[in-house]
Amino acid sequence: MIILNNIITSAAVILMSTLLIPAQVAVGKGSVQNSSISLEFGNENRGMILPWVTNTGAVSGAVEGTVVYDLSDHKVKTKNISGWKDLSVDLTGTTIDPLNSAVDLVTIQNNVTTENLDAVVRIGTPTATPGILVLEDTNKAMILPRVASPHLNIINPAPGMMVYDTTVKQLAVFNGTVWSFWKP
């Protein structure tokens, strides 16, 4: 009986301690800079590739702040209160591989034998908010991958890639053909 009580007590201590640990994730580095960050990336010349959707009109339950790459017009878009806002502002987006024009990256992406439509990663206290990567904390932010001049330093970027350009201090999104830059 003493062993069972020790196991239950140990399990309770472990459970309570994990509930008190702040939800913070560092990708490509050892730790985040401070307690106000939920997700932070390392300093390599890499970006974050957004989820590809066939059409933003087909995305059900999207909440404000959702960011996707729309395959219908090859644009990076964000959801706001009045609808979807185009962040690409360019009509030449594509999913054709620039190194091999015979390859459409959509074909590669759609060539998946099994896809878990319910897959989700949540950082923070889970809610019912839909998404693939959901940052749940109300008092923490995500730090985008930081790259100096991504249009020069990211070799063969993927359509739907997003970074923070440290040279011009702007958000940069790639639509498959060109980078678009946004400042506050």
Segments the model singles out, each with a brief description of its role:
Residues I2-I7, Q24-P184:
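C-terminal trimerization/auto-chaperone modules of long, extracellular attachment fibers and adhesins
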